[in-house]
């Protein structure tokens, strides 16, 4: 058991070393794509889980818009991914109106408003 703990500690130290060596913009871009994937998962549900997709899309937008010019080579890709997932959200929202939006209330956030 002690050997397993030592091996796990060594592995954690190696992961920390690799993360510390990577540019922060690369690590953040990876996490932003995780938000994209999370939104896509919620949008692909039947029916789409629009409230949960909104959270992921809003998180993605918050990071991309706040760090303009600081996301390195991944920035154009992240902006395009954000635009695509927002477009998918709008299309699915129109095809699957929630009871609240049918009553005149619209969901805020993920559509870019």
PLM ranges: what are they?
Residues 1-113:
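A charge-rich, low-complexity, intrinsically flexible signal that marks solvent-exposed coils, linkers
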